[in-house]
Amino acid sequence: LVTSFSEIDKNINKDELIENTEQFLKEKAVYHTMLKAAEDISAGDVDTYVILDKFEKSCNISLVTDLGLGVKSNIDDIIADLTTVEDKIPSTWEWLDDALDGGFLQAGKSLYVFAGETNIGKSIFLGNIASNIARQGKNVLLITLEMSELLYARRICTNISKIPMKEMAVNGSSLRAAITESSGNIYIKEFPPSTITPNTIKAFAKKFTDQGIKLDAIVIDYLNLIHSPIGNNSYERIKNVTEQVRAISYVFNCPIISATQLNRAGFDQDNPDLATISESIGLAATADVIMSIFQNDEDRDLGIIRLGMMKNRYGPRGMTQPMRIDYSTLTIEQADDIDLEEDDSMLNTLAGLSRTVQ
């Protein structure tokens, strides 16, 4: 039956169809088991063992026939896979791409998260990632739960055109030329915060595949503003949201890049760790890569913002990299001319001299 449906509509995701069909059959089986149990109880025929057995069978319905990978029987496939190079989508920041072994996984099945304190620039990083991916001729869906579509579009336009945001209004022709000549496309969709679930995002993204548009990346600003009907506390809700969002990358075979907040302990901290992620350590356990964004007062004055690797399933972690940020065009670039130790030492010396003078 599932195969028949997939032959009718080539855009149907077979795994998702099996999952939904399986869920439907389970719900129907449980419903009919409840009705039968009620009838038996009314007739005075109560056998709790039989009732429990029927409920367990109903809940254990499975349409999965694939037994997985047999290490012995599939050794040739395993050996062949050792030399397979997975396609990546570069972030265009050399430090990050090296850490990710080439960039974001093009086939998806991965969730990348930027973590930072309030107003540190998480949306600026997400906007830069969206622009950098689109410049490679890719289609990017950007879900915004905090800013309006037009405000986000302004940020994207100033980044792509390199026309300062304050000057775009008087440079309409140059702006139009820069945007129309750029490769790829970015689709920005705004939803009110805390009103949509991961399923809402999945249903919306499906509209693109229904129209024959392959999404190469999905950017979500940001995870904590997605609603979860499941969970009695913030830990359970954020954990569920993160798991469901990561699952979307399997459905559309593209990476998902998002952001999250740091808690108070992570504010003004150099190179914050996973313990400073706000609300739920479940997010840290689920995401494949988590990058910290941090900046001190001296950095801000010098137009520097730092990126740290908090968690990385695809490479090393624990290192940091200074980035240059141009606030006039909201452009972030790797700062290779800055030596971390030497720069930090200089900044600390200047800060000490400043305190002495005061």
Whereabouts are the PLM-identified features?
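Cytosolic-facing regulatory segments adjacent to core modules
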Residues: 97, 102, 132-214, 228, ...
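Conserved ATPase-coupling elements of RecA-like P-loop NTPase cores
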Residues: 227-234
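Noncatalytic partner-interaction/assembly domains of nucleic-acid and motor enzyme complexes
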Residues: 1-24, 357-358
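Structural recognition of the conserved hydrophobic beta-strand(s) that form the central parallel beta-sheet
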Residues: 255-260
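Amphipathic alpha-helical transducer elements in NTP-driven molecular machines
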Residues: 11, 27, 90-93, 150, ...
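The Walker A/P-loop phosphate-binding site
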Residues: 63-163, 176, 186-188, 351-357
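Walker B catalytic acidic pair
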Residues: 222
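C-terminal regions of RecA-like/P-loop NTPase motor modules
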Residues: 199-218, 232, 244, 250-252, ...
